Each structure stands twice: as structure tokens, then as C-alpha cells.
Amino acid sequence: MRSHFCTEISEKDVGKTIKVAGWCNTYRDHGGVVFIDLRDKSGLVQLVCDPSSKAYEKALEVRSEFVLVAKGRVRLRGPGLENPKLKTGKIEIVLEELVIENKSATPPIEIGNKNVNEDLRLKYRYLDLRSLNAYEIFKLRSEVALITRNTLAQKGFLEIETPILSKTTPEGARDYLVPSRVHEGEFFALPQSPQLFKQLLMVGGMDRYFQIARCFRDEDLRADRQPEFTQIDAEMSFCDENDVMGVVEDLLQAIFKAVGHTISKPFKRMPYKEAMENYGSDKPDLRFELPLIEVGDCFRDSSNAIFSNIAKDPKNKRIKALNVKGADAVFSRSVLKELEEFVRQFGAQGLAYLQIKEDGIKGPLVKFLSEKGLKNILEKTGAQTGDIVFFGAGDKKIVLDYMGRLRLKVAETLDLIDKDALNFLWVVNFPMFEKTENGYHAAHHPFTMPKNIECEDIEEVEAHAYDVVLNGVELGGGSIRIHKEEMQKKVFEKINIHEEEAQKKFGFLLEALKFGAPPHGGFAIGFDRLIMLMTKSHSIRDVIAFPKTQKASCLLTDAPSPINEEQLRELHIRLRK
């Protein structure tokens, strides 16, 4: 039906007769001469038709998004008529034959216009996908999937599919449940991850497994979350953290090479505690400096009782400083007020600061600090004339969180972030357990191997867990798993999953661990999130063919939708009025 894609045609084809096919991107009638920009997956080419052509009458019928097959002769555009914005901007096709394969209603959205309301774009997603940008995104997505398969296959991994219909074993989010028609009153769950099945594959001697897995989580949505998503999932037997990290680094190096980036290995490693204390995040963005600095000891003798009391409780409290170089010249009073309002959203009571000026140190904290205290702050933060030092004080968790967010906000405001940089990082030595209102739960998941389970302070128990971070975004992570039944039961006890509940939820895993499970570990990388970062897309919805909205609905198909009474009866379900 066609001899060329649109952008395959160039000056070397001048004089040739070719056939192209695609959609009418734009249509123009200039004094009787018809110009059509034809679009296919590769890009645009201009068709031109004057009244002397036998295709002229047909060309007059063409409108936006009509499906066309065109035959014509390639010629150079006239002097001054070239379009440098197009790959085919130096040539055009003089129409000889034109077939309208299909007409189109007036499109409700402009193809390729990102300023169109997102809900409208999602409702007509099949039109939104016609944009050249969308094609490039899904072309890259396909290439990355192929690179993943080839890279892991070369390393001895087998691609094995795990069940979609499984048992409900909540991993932190709510499960999507599927009622069984055959087993009345019982339900399958869609997997939040293949975690337990891939561990069972290791017990089964598969040695190295991977799949590009579909996962489902019924959780509140954000810009980077979807109820169904894809991850690169893998597991290895007879390995330690270094082995797993090495595979991940090799894989990411191969993936980013496809888009022209050279990644150096090994990636930097940072303990969780260091990440939190110095950057206020377990996924720090290291494309810029601005570390958080502990200055609690500078406030021990402060005349402000609030600060001095905080300084005397270093286990549970923090006083953190953030020195912003040269900020005094660019941060007006209104900007300082905006920053204060920003951190208040995340639990801050306010935002104290010191301005280092030519004529001395100014700011609301000055009167509460001794000369020695001020001197110590300047030494610790390296503050100089023209800088502003911001302070956060209070409960450790809250302070680290809002000061970490402030760090990012300041970097964005001052344009300190190199948008083209790729900064990979491993965050390691995560806490094994986190405190909740009802005791403790597993920080990652309860199948992670703890490092020091006998530690008296449960909050000091660390996990053999690791996250890979790119530019402040968690790409994925993993852990070394528990491979002995006794240890697994011990971890369950720590998080108040006692014997009866453990057998009910995870009896099949505990049983499997009795039969010589090998040491094993693995990882999962968020595939959608990876593509989002590689394409610099604003939302994860841009890199999923048919995404859900932030309300977990599909505007295209109107899913979820009610079902009829007969279907409900077959599933033994009665809805409450």
C-alpha cells in the first residue's frame, strides 16, 4: 500500500514516484493549490496538488484526520519555501493519485496539543496516541523491554510468568479482589507483585527468574502511581546484595545506552540514615548540593527554651540547618513568606532563618543565640556574606521530612538542578521495622532478611534491603530474602503476625521453606516510572497506553461500571442498598 514512510523521503528521492499513507495533519487551500501535511508514525511530509492534477477533486474533499494513501512525484520545494522545522522540509510530493481510505469526524482534541484538558485527552486516548511524541514514547518503551529481555537472558535468567489470580496477602496497599463463581463466597486477589511466587521459583531450583510483570494495587493515586502498573521483576539464587546490585547496574547501563547516555558503574551507595539526616529523604536528589546540617549543639545554651529543649533530646528531636548560598540577594520577604507557608504544609510550625549581611547577622533567631552559638553555626554551615541559613526544629521525622522538601523547593526556585544529569544512587541499610499505632510493621516487606534481628531496640534492626534512585526518584529496589522457616516466623512475630495468622496467610511459603530453600534475593524496577524519566514526561499516564485517571477510572471505556443482577447472582454477591 505504501513504498515509504513519510520521513524516509529526502532530496535523494527527487524525481522518483512514491506512495505514502497516513492521516491528514493539516489542510490548506492557497489560491486553488491544495497543501496537505500527511502524518504517519515517522513524522510529516507535505503533499501538493494543483487543479491540473487528476487527484485535485479528491484533494478538495480532504479534511483533518482523514486517512489517505497518496501517490506522487518527489520534488524540491521552491526557494524560500523550505521548512527547517521538518525533517522533510526541503521536499514535497506532487500528487498524482489520492485515495481517501476513511473519513473522520471533527476531532474533539487537537492531535499533539499537550495543553488540552487531560480528562478530554484520556477520553479520546486513541486520538491522543496519534501524536508523534506518543509514538516515540511507546517505541522507546518497546525497545527498553527488548533490551531488558536480552540483557537478563544473557545473564542466565529465565522469563517465567507467575499467576494473576492468586491469594490475598496484602503487602501494604489494598488488594483488588476477584470473586470466584465456582467457590462460593471466596475470592482471588490480583497480585501487588510476584514476590512470593518468585521466591517459590527459587525454592523450585529455577536459579534466575525474571518477567515484565503486571501488578495491581488499590491505593490512592498520585502523579507517579496507577492502580495497574508494570515492573521489571527478577530473583536470583545463591547471591548477596552485591550480586543483585551488579545485575541492576548492568541492566540500567544497557537501557540508558539505547538513548545515548553512558552510565558509569558502580553506583554510589548511601546508608539510609545518612540519606535521611543529610538530605531529608530516602531517595535524595544528588544533582545539586544543599545538604542538611545538624546544628543542635549550637542551641544547647539558647535563651529560647523550645530550641534548647529540642537540642537536649538528640534521639527523638532534630535541629537542621540549610545554608543557601547567595540567597539574600534573590529571596525577597515575600519569597521567604512563601517558603514558610510551604513547609507548614508538612508539619512545620514556622521557618526560622539567619541572613548573613555585610553589616552583621540578621533574622528572628539572632536574639536567642549567644555569640559563640552564632559562630558555631557559621562554622558548621560554611555560611558567608550573602547567604541565608534556614532552620527546622522539632520531632525528628517531621523535621527531616519538611527540611528535605525545602531543599528541593529551594533548588527548583534557584534553578540549581541540571535537568540533563543522570545521578544514580543506591540507598542501603534500611530499617527492617517501622513503628505504627498498632506496633511495628515491615518497612519493605516481611520476607526481607534482617541483619541484626536480636538487637534489643527493634527500631535499630536493619534490613538486607536496597533501593536504586535516579535524580531523586525511586526507580525500584529489592532485598535478600529470608530462606529459613525459623527466621521467617521470627519476623512475623515481630510484626504481630502470630502462628495461626501466619499459617492462614503464608502457610504455603512456610511449608516451602522447610524443603531446602536456597539463599536468594532480587529486585523490581518500576517500568512505567523508568520510561517516564527517560522521556522526561510529566506524568506516568503519558507512558501507559490506556491509563486510569487519578480517581482510578478509565474515561475511555467508563470502567469501572455496574454489572447486571444475573452476573451478581452467578458470583454469589448481593449489593447493599
Curated annotation (Swiss-Prot):
One of its GO terms (biological process) is aspartyl-tRNA aminoacylation. It catalyses: tRNA(Asx) + L-aspartate + ATP = L-aspartyl-tRNA(Asx) + AMP + diphosphate. Residues 195-198 are annotated as: Aspartate. It comes from Helicobacter pylori (strain HPAG1). Its EC number is 6.1.1.23. The gene is aspS. The lineage of its organism: Bacteria, Pseudomonadati, Campylobacterota, Epsilonproteobacteria, Campylobacterales. This is Aspartate--tRNA(Asp/Asn) ligase. Keywords: Aminoacyl-tRNA synthetase, ATP-binding, Cytoplasm, Ligase, Nucleotide-binding, Protein biosynthesis. It comes from the Bacteria.
